[in-house]
């Protein structure tokens, strides 16, 4: 038996004891046992000043579990169980930059300073595991003031349950679902200016909370996506009509946030590749109503035009392209960037290691998974097993799977 004192070294800079994770969970062990290189999925990626240990990221997952926009222990445990198992980056759910920008009354927010502190707890947990963490900043637009989806997928949160059906906003006064959702108020130019200021203020609060990365949500039919799409944006001023006008708010917001956060902090912008009306059956009611011409809805071609504009403003782009088999849209957008170093990811339906690796080998930089992490918090370990790759596990987990080795030692 050794006479040396063997210390269970603490993670640096954490307010409570937690063992140091060096390297972090999810780090690939290279080379593989057979001598071959490890899959690209488990190679590091650097964006600006942040290095991610692998390329499988946790997508934002709304939990509808906050009160007055304040995160709580549910958010800590939901994210913590995944974070300790090693995604390259974990992204906190859509977080409203204005109170009326929540999807439901139970969404997380960052529209006031008091909301920083509970998010700090989550950030500290991630950093205690040597993991990277991001936050997605969002405004739900005309899809706001709903109830939690397990209660009803198409119900409005009324004033009696904390909703704001009289204060729903959008580019134009067009409801999400006619006869179901409230008819929104078209934002004035002055309100658009305030929105940009509030978005920047929320980003600055995210920096104070300690996040490593910020993501701007411009997908899924929420406010910034609504400005992009002619289906929801029928304005006649500088924020509607032409492609240049419809993309103006997203580009101005991206530029303003980029200028307000540290230079070495990565900024992601999540977009939907398409409204999908362009792929509806020729002659169908959807095609006739929403996509009679190539410019009648948001399309893959327009996403291709947008991506270089985002890159020029210092952003990377996760592309919501549908199930994994449709992720070639992300590849198309990546190719449109030419020599740009902008990182592009595929989002959605990526549920096995072979597909994830195939997408990366085709030129994408990152794959993102959401619900699969919900079902299996150890998804990173599962994908590593599928690809016959060893990855570092959190010390508290890995020692039970053959990770009994010589500990870090410190002489007293």
Region spans (language model):
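Flavin-dependent oxidoreductase catalytic cores
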Residues: 1-412
